[in-house]
Amino acid sequence: MELQEVLHMNGGEGDTSYAKNSSYNQLVLTKVKPVLEQCIRELLRANLPNINKCIKVADLGCASGPNTLLTVRDIVQSIDKVGQEEKNELEHPTIQIFLNDLFQNDFNSVFKLLPSFYRKLEKENGRKIGSCLISAMPGSFYGRLFPEESMHFLHSCYSVHWLSQVPSGLVTELGISANKGIIYSSKASPPPVQKAYLDQFTKDFTTFLRIHSEELLSGGRMLLTCICKGDESDGLNTIDLLERAINDLVVEGLLEEEKLDSFNLPLYTPSLEVVKCIVEEEGSFEILYLETFKVRYDAGFSIDDDYQVRSLFQVYCDEHVKAAYVTFFFRAVFEPILASHFGEAIMPDLFHRFAKNAAKALRLGNGFYNSLIISLAKKPEKSDV
């Protein structure tokens, strides 16, 4: 099965769907919002062509469920807030927003939410229906999505750490896994494996920057957030917990060792230095803001499905309940690609073991996602300088 067919979140609205298990990402969006507002402010002040008529925006790797429209809401509110503060003709410009993800993404779950979303925008922001136009643009963001110099602002949250393919060179000349017992580029991976993953990320991210710089108008902005490398004090990350669970299944004879050794996640968590270096070497963008932040991976537990704060009793419950929350979120993201390789039947047992590992990590006070946020401005063409 092609990677693009399985690289998506759990769709629908069931118990293991991304729509029901993405409150952690809502907290990440909250962290990003001040930088988003500043990015929008600088964009509107840049007075790009046609920006007073229609601001063209895209969310790359938008996923599905309510978080997709939370991102849209934050972008629209930021544009309206800046327009009101600046008291200019951009107070309520038309906004055209393209939602991008791979073809297997559950766009329908987003479309079902649009009528109520438009009504809410009209009630809370005074935006007439038709002044914010939302549509889908399916396809890989490692390829061309929009005409040249047609976009004002590109946004992506928790997507660019996904690679376009599993790196080559992960199998030795003897046909043996070079990353035996490991499912991604971890600290325990051999140097050649780490280099293979770094090379693939460098190639993909360079392509991403080049292609989307061509789609942006000169002076256009791009805001990216992705998972990045942590430090020793963070303890095991969730992929390490998954890796342990898979290895346990192999040791107990419930899963073939070959299945483990032939599985490599198409995911890379870069360091801040790597991202900075790639942007500078590609050369199309100026870095306006670059920072990292960390959030415990049970932090979103304090937010319920309607993004309301839970009771103190719920927030301060034991680590097993919080581990279940972490497991549902992780499952919503990773189950499609795991099930395509290991089979649907083993998923309940696998995630049960994952939950046990997560509870232990939380009990020890470990468990953080490290994130990187970078704000970019497209450099003017030499002829424009």
Curated annotation (Swiss-Prot):
Residue runs in coiled coils: none
Disulfide bonds: none
Record-listed Mg(2+) binding positions: 179, 261, 263-264
Pfam families: Methyltransf_7 (PF03492)
Biological pathway: Alkaloid biosynthesis
Top enzyme class: transferase
Binding positions for S-adenosyl-L-homocysteine per the UniProt entry: 18, 62, 67, 101-102, 140-141, 157
Binding site for caffeine: 158, 161-162, 238, 369
Site description Involved in substrate discrimination, residues in chain: 155, 267, 344
Key words of the record: Magnesium, Metal-binding, Methyltransferase, Transferase
A molecular-function term among this protein's GO annotations: methyltransferase activity
CC cofactor: Mg(2+)
Cofactor annotation comment: Binds 1 Mg(2+) ion per subunit.
Purpose of the protein: May be involved in the biosynthesis of caffeine.
Name under which the protein is recorded: Probable caffeine synthase MTL2
Taxonomic source organism: Coffea canephora
